[in-house]
Amino acid sequence: QGHPLYDKIVIYFVESLYFLEQYQTVVEIINQIKDENIEHATRMALLPIQDMAKEKLNQRQLKASEVLRAFQETQFEEQINLLIDLIDHHLGIFNLTLAQIIENEVLHPNVQSLILEYLRLSEWSAEVKFNKIDENITVIPTELPGIERTNFTQNIIPKVIDQLEIDSPSSIELAKSLLNQHAIIMYPITLNDINDDVLVACYLKLLSERFNIDANYESVTQQDWDMFIEVIQKLQ
């Protein structure tokens, strides 16, 4: 504020956000600007944009509601896309619905992970109980770390990648893809029965044997390897 072209810049900025489909941001920014000392003409230019943005948000919410009502019959890809959209645009609106879905429906592990992420970001503090890859889980979403902050993501993946940077740099993207996929599928399960160093060695052994990737790793006992493979088979 104070710039001679402030009002024109504001209108241009808000219009740009609208055409980029950032409807929630448009609504929030105009709410802030309305309290400022701006020209009446600027205010009258912004209010219709806010109304249109609210209408777009309502349309999105209605569409999301319709899909959620038949969530179990929806294809996997559409479930994923819907949950990503809900995380981006509708936090807090469908908490109870999604909590009921994860507790009562048979879902792909990736879908379960995204529902948990939605509930965590929406600060859902009630217990959620569900079964994931043959394990009964009870969590309170607000107490969960995000997928990007689990021990697997912050410690296991970097150690595997660090070793591959030495032994086989060309295989890093393949390894990252596999490891990130496993991180999402397992969330929020922690592999407490296998310590971190053994888990890193097991992943390097897996990459070496199944994908012909050159990787040096510490020796792994047959018991640890069998336990690791049992987990991996559930993730496929």
What are the residue ranges of the model-derived segments?
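Inward-facing hydrophobic residues that define packing positions of alpha-helical scaffold repeats
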Residues: 1, 29-31, 86, 98-99
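Charged, low-complexity intrinsically disordered regulatory/assembly segments
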Residues: 133-236
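Structural signature of alpha-solenoid helical repeat junctions
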Residues: 4-5, 78, 111
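Amphipathic alpha-helical scaffolding segments comprising HEAT/armadillo-like alpha-solenoid repeats
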Residues: 27, 61-69, 91-103, 125-131
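Residue-level signature for tetratricopeptide repeat
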Residues: 16, 53, 84-85
